[in-house]
Amino acid sequence: MTQLVELKEVCLSFDGRSVLDKVSFTLNKGKITTLVGPNGAGKSTLSKLVLGLLTPDSGQITRSRDLRVGYVPQRLYLDPTLPLTVRRFLQLGKNGRLSIEEALNRVGAEDLLDNRMQKLSGGEMQRVLLARALLVKPELLVLDEPVQGVDINGQIELYALISQLAAEFNCAVLMVSHDLHLVMASTHEVICLNRHVCCHGEPESVARHPEFARLFGRPEQEVLAVYTHHHHCDGEHHHHEPQVPVIRLPSRNQ
């Protein structure tokens, strides 16, 4: 398994307040890692460290040379009076027509090309932002709350799409969960963060961990009849109808 990013004992403080304390993990090619934790746990800050937008106070971050990174931000503010179509938005990075159309096709948003950005639904906006991230042909995808503002069916579709793209590009994925109500079954590893790494591992093992239970209570295990995700010995990712186990976490308001 090819390692793309490694964090070792990373610490970061803002105004004398510790935000991250001795955080260590790796991001590997073809592996989906989901970062969960309560508000103020340092999740978005950690993603910015991975992106190189922040520098740690101590510890070490190692990235593979010339790493191509696609990023989907937590939110995108657009002036409502700006006449910006999806086409023009994706052309801002000097991307060509064929590349833009191919990226939109990959995320199932080819019909949105001439729509105004400000008129997109939550799910449509996330697909367009994901298409933009794919234009760099990423080795690493960093997704900060990729299903924010999307209904439950749209969330499931986006999670399945992310899993499909990770397999197609054979890229690493770091996904930040903010609302904490779903962790997709296709995640290879969950990192539970509360300024430090409380626990990590496969979703089922993390859900049973005492530290996870202390932060979130005992999550209810449910089965949603949507799709299943299996990793076969041939290295391929296979989706089958109709069941997927999903760990449902308490929302931050509970």
From Swiss-Prot:
<feature type="region of interest" description="Disordered">
    <location>
        <begin position="233"/>
        <end position="254"/>
    </location>
</feature>
<keyword id="KW-1278">Translocase</keyword>
<dbReference type="Pfam" id="PF00005">
    <property type="entry name" value="ABC_tran"/>
</dbReference>
<keyword id="KW-0067">ATP-binding</keyword>
<comment type="function">
    <text>Part of the ABC transporter complex ZnuABC involved in zinc import. Responsible for energy coupling to the transport system.</text>
</comment>
<dbReference type="InterPro" id="IPR017871">
    <property type="entry name" value="ABC_transporter-like_CS"/>
</dbReference>
<protein>
    <recommendedName>
        <fullName>Zinc import ATP-binding protein ZnuC</fullName>
        <ecNumber>7.2.2.20</ecNumber>
    </recommendedName>
</protein>
<dbReference type="InterPro" id="IPR003439">
    <property type="entry name" value="ABC_transporter-like_ATP-bd"/>
</dbReference>
<dbReference type="InterPro" id="IPR050153">
    <property type="entry name" value="Metal_Ion_Import_ABC"/>
</dbReference>
<feature type="binding site">
    <location>
        <begin position="37"/>
        <end position="44"/>
    </location>
    <ligand>
        <name>ATP</name>
    </ligand>
</feature>
<keyword id="KW-0997">Cell inner membrane</keyword>
<dbReference type="GO" id="GO:0010043">
    <property type="term" value="P:response to zinc ion"/>
</dbReference>
<keyword id="KW-1003">Cell membrane</keyword>
<dbReference type="GO" id="GO:0015633">
    <property type="term" value="F:ABC-type zinc transporter activity"/>
</dbReference>
<dbReference type="GO" id="GO:0005886">
    <property type="term" value="C:plasma membrane"/>
</dbReference>
<feature type="compositionally biased region" description="Basic and acidic residues">
    <location>
        <begin position="233"/>
        <end position="242"/>
    </location>
</feature>
<feature type="domain" description="ABC transporter">
    <location>
        <begin position="5"/>
        <end position="219"/>
    </location>
</feature>
<dbReference type="GO" id="GO:0005524">
    <property type="term" value="F:ATP binding"/>
</dbReference>
<keyword id="KW-0472">Membrane</keyword>
<comment type="similarity">
    <text>Belongs to the ABC transporter superfamily. Zinc importer (TC 3.A.1.15.5) family.</text>
</comment>
<keyword id="KW-0864">Zinc transport</keyword>
<keyword id="KW-0547">Nucleotide-binding</keyword>
<keyword id="KW-0862">Zinc</keyword>
<keyword id="KW-0813">Transport</keyword>
<keyword id="KW-0406">Ion transport</keyword>
<dbReference type="InterPro" id="IPR027417">
    <property type="entry name" value="P-loop_NTPase"/>
</dbReference>
<dbReference type="GO" id="GO:0016887">
    <property type="term" value="F:ATP hydrolysis activity"/>
</dbReference>
<comment type="subunit">
    <text>The complex is composed of two ATP-binding proteins (ZnuC), two transmembrane proteins (ZnuB) and a solute-binding protein (ZnuA).</text>
</comment>
<dbReference type="InterPro" id="IPR003593">
    <property type="entry name" value="AAA+_ATPase"/>
</dbReference>
